[in-house]
């Protein structure tokens, strides 16, 4: 009997989910300062966040934060970010192939674009609902400032969960689910599908082998396309999640307030750090994801051969 090679053995759902979660956590740790800079730029210009400190550009925001609030502030909210990736990315990315195969109904032909989009929408929707509380806590910890003697709303991750649930309501932990769902519908539909299509085009046309350079280029292209399309929903999501009770009656109200007071460019605030963060996050996550899947399947094959 001829055994399958490692490249021919498809990773199990468990391997994909585990690999996605670990890879996403690693990517988040490395790129978190960019995410914090993005949040600060996105909320800049709001009434409640107006201050004498103005952030300019990616490096300017990072250095200003480090000088005025200390380097640790760049990683404020990281525990919630890690929790988010464990509950969110592991499902959104890890289950993508499995759901895609389900929509393909076991056909031997490659999945259609519709199958890929449907898989991205389903995994993204489930992941947003499960991971939304971690998103709320992460954004609020990143947004709060310790300047001018202002007492912070929250002293830490678990304190934030408790304060939000007890002083606002338990349902507030799911605040901003609608714009976050919109954002992740765009991200999943663009990021995973673009990465999938780009990787397939490079490999099938024998431009690049299915290895690190191919994964790197595919991730960069997916990152740019995703950032451009998802930026408006991302800014509205951040503003709405970070808002005080009653500040914005609804998500459309938040969007209209931004448009009338700050203009259409407000929807692209923080675009550069958002792209740098998402592109670098994509590169780290997808490259680690692909390599980790391969190594885990190699280990599994080795164990199967010895038993």
From Swiss-Prot:
Protein name: Mitochondrial brown fat uncoupling protein 1
Segments on the Mitochondrial matrix face: 33-73, 134-178, 233-266
Regulation: Has no constitutive proton transporter activity and has to be activated by long-chain fatty acids/LCFAs. Inhibited by purine nucleotides. Both purine nucleotides and LCFAs bind the cytosolic side of the transporter and directly compete to activate or inhibit it. Activated by noradrenaline and reactive oxygen species. Despite lacking canonical translational encoding for selenocysteine, a small pool of the protein has been observed to selectively incorporate selenocysteine at 'Cys-254'.
Gene Ontology cellular component annotations, sorted alphabetically: mitochondrial inner membrane
Species lineage: Eukaryota, Metazoa, Chordata, Craniata, Vertebrata
Annotated signal sequence range: none
Residues annotated to bind fatty acid 16:0: 56, 269
Role description: Mitochondrial protein responsible for thermogenic respiration, a specialized capacity of brown adipose tissue and beige fat that participates in non-shivering adaptive thermogenesis to temperature and diet variations and more generally to the regulation of energy balance. Functions as a long-chain fatty acid/LCFA and proton symporter, simultaneously transporting one LCFA and one proton through the inner mitochondrial membrane. However, LCFAs remaining associated with the transporter via their hydrophobic tails, it results in an apparent transport of protons activated by LCFAs.
Main location: mitochondrion
Keyword rRNA-binding on entry: no
Stretches in topological domain Mitochondrial intermembrane: 1-10, 97-116, 196-212, 290-307
Protein family (similarity comment): Belongs to the mitochondrial carrier (TC 2.A.29) family.
């Amino acid at each position: 009997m001829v055994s399958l090679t490692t490249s021919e053995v498809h990773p199990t759902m468990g391997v994909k989910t585990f690999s996605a979660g670990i890879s996403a956590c690693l990517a988040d740790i490395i790129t978190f300062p960019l995410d914090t800079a993005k949040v600060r730029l996105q909320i800049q210009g709001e009434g409640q966040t107006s201050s004498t400190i103005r952030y300019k550009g990616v490096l300017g925001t990072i250095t200003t934060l480090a000088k005025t609030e200390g380097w640790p502030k760049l990683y404020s909210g990281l525990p919630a970010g890690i929790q988010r990736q464990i509950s969110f990315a592991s499902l959104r990315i890890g289950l993508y192939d499995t759901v895609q195969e389900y929509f393909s109904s076991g056909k031997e032909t490659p999945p259609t674009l519709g199958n890929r989009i449907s898989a991205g929408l389903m995994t993204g929707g489930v992941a947003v609902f499960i991971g939304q509380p971690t998103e709320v806590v992460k954004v609020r910890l990143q947004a709060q400032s310790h300047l001018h003697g202002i007492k912070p709303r929250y002293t830490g991750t678990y304190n934030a969960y408790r304060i939000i649930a007890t002083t606002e309501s338990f349902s507030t932990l799911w605040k901003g689910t609608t714009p976050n769902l919109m954002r992740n519908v765009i991200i999943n539909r663009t990021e995973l599908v673009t990465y999938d299509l780009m990787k397939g085009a490079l490999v099938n046309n024998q431009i690049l082998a299915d290895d690190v350079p191919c994964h790197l280029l595919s991730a960069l292209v997916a990152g740019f396309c995703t950032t451009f399309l998802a930026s408006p929903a991302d800014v509205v999501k951040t503003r709405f999640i970070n808002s005080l009770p009653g500040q914005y009656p609804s998500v459309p109200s938040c969007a209209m307030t931004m448009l009338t007071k700050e203009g259409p460019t407000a929807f692209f605030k923080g675009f550069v750090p958002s792209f740098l963060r998402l592109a670098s996050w994509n590169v780290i996550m997808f490259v680690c994801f692909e390599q980790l899947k391969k190594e885990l399947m190699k280990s599994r094959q080795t164990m199967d051969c010895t038993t």
